[in-house]
Amino acid sequence: MKLEHPDRLMNRTPLSLAALETHDAFAERHIGPDAASQQAMLDTLGFASRAALIDAVIPASIRRAETLPLGPFAQPKSEAEALAALRALADKNQVFRSYIGQGYHDTHTPAVILRNVLENPAWYTAYTPYQPEISQGRLEALLNFQQMVADLTGLAISNASLLDEATAAAEAMTLLQRTGKPKSNVFYVADDVLPQTLEVIRTRALPIGIEVKTGPAADAAQANAFGVLLQYPGVNGDVRDYRALTDAIHAAGGHVVVAADLLALTVLTPPGEWGADVAIGNTQRFGVPMGFGGPHAAYLAVRDEFKRQMPGRLVGVTVDAQGKPALRLALQTREQHIRREKATSNVCTAQALLAIMASMYAVYHGPHGLKTIALRVNRIAALLAAGVKQLGFATVNDTFFDTLTIDTGARTAQVHEFAKAKRINLRRVSDTQVGVSVDETTTRDDLADLLDVFAQAAGGTAPAVDALDAGLAGVAALPAGLERTSAYLTHHVFNRHHSETEMLRYLRSLSDKDLALDRSMIPLGSCTMKLNATSEMLPVTWPEFGGIHPFAPAEQTVGYREMIDQLEQMLVAATGYAAVSLQPNAGSQGEYAGLLIIHAYHASRGEGHRDVCLIPASAHGTNPASAHMAGMKVVVVACDAQGNVDIADLKAKAEQHSANLAAIMITYPSTHGVFEQNVREICEIVHAHGGQVYVDGANMNAMVGLTAPGQFGGDVSHLNLHKTFCIPHGGGGPGVGPVAVGAHLAKFLPNQRSTGYARAEDGIGAVSAAPYGSASILPISWMYIAMMGAKNLTAATETAILNANYIAKRLAPHYPVLYSGPGGLVAHECILDLRPIKESSGISVDDVAKRLMDYGFHAPTMSFPVPGTLMVEPTESESQEELDRFIAAMIAIREEIRAVEEGRADREDNPLRHAPHTAAVVTANEWPHAYSREQAAYPVASLGTNKYWPPVGRADNAYGDRNLFCSCVPMSDYA
């Protein structure tokens, strides 16, 4: 029901309970414009109702006839009800003490980081820092991450995170394939690499013709491989000296990738010092909860010669217009949105928020604190080794950092039974061996419990921890010559913020530099920067979700899996497909998985030769990049003057490639913000030639409840839960990219055979390290759908379309709207054409984007899908007041441009060419411009009470790429 004023309710008799219940209250807080505002906007558009507008926008041939079939979630829950229902599911999980290891460890998240980063909307609602001037805070935090990784690995340069350790390993493999031994297609994986990593590597290698060989690390030099992956320490805990082996691999013409534990590298010689070419790994144990598998920030570091081949984001140092240091994303020409099928990777969203947490963990503890944690972990492992030996058990590995593999023989089942009684999980290595990985949360009481488990199995008495500690003067746990001697984290940022006061102020100083959703609307087209409600975010930090290991026994994860099953069914209802997998931990990975599923389907029918993928010229860069990674040949389909798929060209290309046609990849609504009228015909043409239809779900926010790709001809789609379903963007991740498929493709959904969470045997290989990907943020989308219900999800979609059309209508007299459908209407976003302005005034789309910062706004999406344009997506969460504020800013900027066109302002010395204007520039003694300081900083009256100041002037991108520097800069540079 609609909330009404209490005075009006008091005049009713009798007051029923139903009249006072507010199940729809959350929807009214999520959807920005109230009823009066919506009607005012509809009046502007010339429609009597929202329903009439939607009838005019969406083709009748694809309209959904029924209400979203959400079953028990059809009716909205209040925030309290939804939290209680989710709490009931969380309580079904059992949080055991986890010593499983295998790349995931329990950790303490410092409270100051938990509250002021993970739970702070200034950090989690920000977008990827493509506009560097308003992203300096998170860019600095990510630069700290890069410095941390480079220091600890001993390599020259690190990227700003990848999706997980297994994905990073696969990316390292393809990096070396591009740069390594030209006559070899072999990638050699040592047999003590994490099993989930090997599984993802196999998935990624198969479609691009890489042969994966496994075996003892010692045999790697004889494998004739272009690359070798070593684990340091190994999955069984061994710490091996790989110096001679690395030299031998190099002598044979190969390169070496090392999967390294960053905490171990505080005490072990780093890979870069013994010849590694690439290091990869996971930063999860630096303060990020296990979360049933994610999200966590992986890392990839390389020798200097490989820096231009690195996948993922890279933060670099440059200068601004005033010559002061500024940070920006560097070497963007490597990325999929520019190079398309020639990109180094299809990764877009990575794990920025988690990388920031990990970097702040290092800032908080500093080098001394990290080493103390590492030495304590190693000491506990040594005491455990000594204790189990006293009890008659042998350790398989004599060298170790934190992990022991213990030979338990016929008593293995007893060991697990006694451990279970103490709510302890050990790794099930085999029927005769168990693994124990300790971590920073392991206390002396925990150690005593572990010893007691083995004592019970041995029929003896556990040795006392204090006695073991007193009797163990030293232990040869690390190989001779592998103890680290080099310094790390020497930069001042890791050595000055160790009191909570200093740490708190540092975090605040960084967040104050950035413009996120907590300050203003972010109207990025194709990005769906909607509300990330607090009640949706709360469960992320519940220990019942955060404290679960991804490979915990199934009986301990009942609540998690029930929640996941429910969310999958919610997404099935929204998409019209038959089945969903939540394993892909980014949209790019869901897209990749979808293409592999299509290939598996064709292969199952004896048509594995089908490898041609049709992609419209207007498609997002991830589409061709993913198709290339999936082993497909990209054939571009032309678009007509209105931006729609050229049907004649599609028919010709489909006919030409009929025998080998695998798929078409389309986005709907299209990337130009319109519901194409002939989408059913497009699907039918491709199906007639034996192909499958991949519908990119990036624009699903315009479809939920109104139409569904699974109902108008799609066979497979990926979704972006960090767009449509309210997971925040986190400044560049985390994301979740579920893949949804029709019934005929369901059995091919991603598997993970190396764990106890396998799906259908015909499933493609794993695309993420954990069976459910970034599981700990799935409650966000569950909460959103549960609190909205079927009717309000549809209303949200309708309002997103209303808001976009309102902006288009209001701005059309000032900026041409490039594409529209019948009646001049758009879908959930609109493209403003600035190319005529460039011709008439010399003002570029970049100038307008930077000038918007002076008005307190993040720019819309620049030059996509058409160069020289801005794509605006307001989402349903923005109020009419905020839309009007943005419209006023855009109109004011158009008047500033008009002054240039008419000669009233200089073509170079004008507010747009010199934007953004910092406080330092505006208050300087010298003011060299013809326009006033007031026009520079306060061009509209509303800024007088709510002014955001960009911390740096316009970043010099060309300088940054010419003088690539991707490490922390000295304090003197900020003076």
UniProtKB/Swiss-Prot annotation:
Lineage top rank: taxon: Bacteria
Keyword list, A-Z: Oxidoreductase, Pyridoxal phosphate
N6-(pyridoxal phosphate)lysine PTM sites in chain numbering: K723
Cofactor(s) this protein cannot do without: pyridoxal 5'-phosphate
GO molecular function: glycine binding; glycine dehydrogenase (decarboxylating) activity; pyridoxal phosphate binding
Function: The glycine cleavage system catalyzes the degradation of glycine. The P protein binds the alpha-amino group of glycine through its pyridoxal phosphate cofactor; CO(2) is released and the remaining methylamine moiety is then transferred to the lipoamide cofactor of the H protein.
Keyword Oxidoreductase applies: yes
Catalytic activity: N(6)-[(R)-lipoyl]-L-lysyl-[glycine-cleavage complex H protein] + glycine + H(+) = N(6)-[(R)-S(8)-aminomethyldihydrolipoyl]-L-lysyl-[glycine-cleavage complex H protein] + CO2
Subunit details: The glycine cleavage system is composed of four proteins: P, T, L and H.
Protein name: Glycine dehydrogenase (decarboxylating)
Gene Ontology BP terms: glycine decarboxylation via glycine cleavage system
Family note: Belongs to the GcvP family.
Cross-referenced PANTHER family: GLYCINE DEHYDROGENASE (DECARBOXYLATING), MITOCHONDRIAL, GLYCINE DEHYDROGENASE, DECARBOXYLATING
Enzyme Commission number(s): 1.4.4.2
InterPro entries registered for this protein in UniProt: GcvP, GDC-P_C, GDC-P_N, GDC_P, PyrdxlP-dep_Trfase, PyrdxlP-dep_Trfase_major, PyrdxlP-dep_Trfase_small
Pfam family, one: GcvP2_C
Entry keyword annotation includes Oxidoreductase: yes
Gene Ontology cellular-component terms listed: cytosol; glycine cleavage complex
